[in-house]
């Protein structure tokens, strides 16, 4: 309750701050303000109390004051006129006392008497909120209020349900994402709680004001939307109309605010998703860095421990500890990476629980990745006996080898992180436009798609880098596997191992160098398989590079067509020439030379065969020119023609429609023509009759011969007009 006599309630447990006082004041300042208000305003009379109910314990020391207030109130009631029955019915249907809104059960609560004149106008919505408010006041353990100085009372604390209802939607989204995704953001404080604390500090020292029946207080109950739309409702007699108008305005603003919250939720999700994308990319980069660092340190430790110092030295222990530290960091980065993956899955699919994303396939994939990245040389010296059979002598060989070999070679499996980094840094994956187009075409942007695009853009570079990397790694692996059983230092030498890998990679296999151990044989087997695939890719890339482009094909086809046209013309000319020569030597000459005739006949047949062969080549060239590109061009031409035909058909339909409208107009005109003709004939007949009557009148006045008057109604004799049964002489 503020100083103006208004009781504001923002729903259950939600109290808006007073706009006049933006910050809380201290206790001394509040006491001074209360004293000034008490000096300026006289104490109003108290509301009537029921005589059958005793007063609360907090007001028992003041019975004389209450009696005086009751007497004054009774006098005012006698002076006031009676109220209408409609207002009393409203009062009986919804009995609401102002003290129920902010007072505690132990404080003074005066029940309304039977003849109370406090007229209230609550709506059905307000009444339901008041009943809920009373229920929470009576049943909530946190709704008790402590009386402050000056007879004031503190506002009740909100229940957990009320606190959940008053929370900001943006804060709720952030808190829910933190709850389900594993703490991406720090928990944010609830805005409504801070506002409630501010209101408690402001209204702590305000005294409880009592109103007389002649000036009843207005109880304004509004929702959070009403408080945002209307911060303060003034106290005036026409309160019902203004409160209904405010309720209508608040209900009209509900849907835009819901849409705004929805837009805020979508914007927050998109921003959160973008942040997760960036974090996932950085985690992948860091994982690749630490993975490559562990591989490099492993290679250095293996080479140094073979030639310079032993496995039990401090240098080897320090390097292995460094490898273990980098492996632990790598495992943590991988866990963080998959955490971001799960969070992205939750955001993309709108899931409520992150456990929905943990399918058996994902769990198996994460476990396999953790196992691959966890393999590394353990600090310390561990040995085992390794037995093998030499290649050419077939004698068994037994040597004591380090366990680090078994744990070092699988560390090269960490190179799969390169493909992940390439995917996350690819423009096709990071560009929003390309991802939108791919989603419309149902394309999955994965590592396979990125490698295909790289093979299309720069196939030579990709094959070169892959072949050289595979060559070096396989050669070093063969060297490590063969060093314990190679007594002649052939395959254990790095250059010799590179030669062995190269001839195996190219599927040559001279046989001068062969591996002794199963480890080396397995590496050579994998190298041969990869070499066959790379060789096929090289052949395909070279063939694609040697293929003519579209422009080059068109130029080549044009030149070949020109040459074939010339050859056809030459062959046709030869046919005509030989035909003329044969006719000349057989018909025109007196003495026939049979040798020349046979010669020209032979050339004539050769010219005919040459003409046929050239025409066949021209047909083949035309068939080769009809490629897919030409078909697409023809399709475009046909599409243009069909479009033009459609336009013309539309124009023709429009013209036919105009002709139909004109024909309808002509039909209507022809239908109205008989009526027009009848009207015209009638008018002419009337004019003729009038002319005859005028002529007859003139003849009578002059004294001409008398014409007998006809018996017709218009005064014209039947003999004046010829009939079909009278001749022209009778007329």
Curated annotation (Swiss-Prot):
Primary location: membrane
Compositional bias segments (type: Polar residues): 112-132, 239-256
Catalytic activity: K(+)(in) = K(+)(out)
A Pfam family the protein falls into: CaMBD
Compositional bias ranges of the Basic and acidic residues kind: 1-11
Impact when changing residue 516 to N: No effect on inhibition by apamin
Sites of Phosphoserine modification: 167
GO molecular function: calmodulin binding; inward rectifier potassium channel activity; small conductance calcium-activated potassium channel activity
Intramembrane portions: 494-514
Record field: compositional bias (Pro residues): 41-51
Membrane topology according to the record: Multi-pass membrane protein
Subcellular location: Cell membrane; Cytoplasm, Myofibril, Sarcomere, Z line
Assigned keywords, A-Z: Calmodulin-binding, Cell membrane, Coiled coil, Cytoplasm, Disease variant, Ion channel, Ion transport, Membrane, Phosphoprotein, Transmembrane, Transmembrane helix, Transport
Effect of substituting residue 485 to N: Reduced inhibition by apamin. Does not affect small conductance calcium-activated potassium channel activity
Annotated stretches, region: Disordered: 1-170, 239-258, 709-731
Presence of the UniProt keyword Nucleotide-binding in the record: no
Segments crossing the lipid bilayer: 288-308, 315-335, 366-386, 405-425, 454-474, 523-543
Mechanisms controlling activity: Inhibited by bee venom neurotoxin apamin.
GO cellular component, one term: neuron projection
Region of interest: Calmodulin-binding: 561-637
GO biological process, one term: potassium ion transmembrane transport
Family assignment from sequence similarity: Belongs to the potassium channel KCNN family. KCa2.3/KCNN3 subfamily.
Annotated disorder: Zimmermann-Laband syndrome 3: A form of Zimmermann-Laband syndrome, a rare developmental disorder characterized by facial dysmorphism with bulbous nose and thick floppy ears, gingival enlargement, hypoplasia or aplasia of terminal phalanges and nails, hypertrichosis, joint hyperextensibility, and hepatosplenomegaly. Some patients manifest intellectual disability with or without epilepsy. ZLS3 inheritance is autosomal dominant.
Record text on subunit structure and interactions: Homodimer. Heteromultimer with KCNN2 or KCNN1; this modulates plasma membrane expression and consequently the small conductance calcium-activated potassium channel activity. The complex is composed of 4 channel subunits each of which binds to a calmodulin subunit which regulates the channel activity through calcium-binding. Interacts with CALM1.
Protein name per UniProt: Small conductance calcium-activated potassium channel protein 3
Species classification: Eukaryota, Metazoa, Chordata, Craniata, Vertebrata
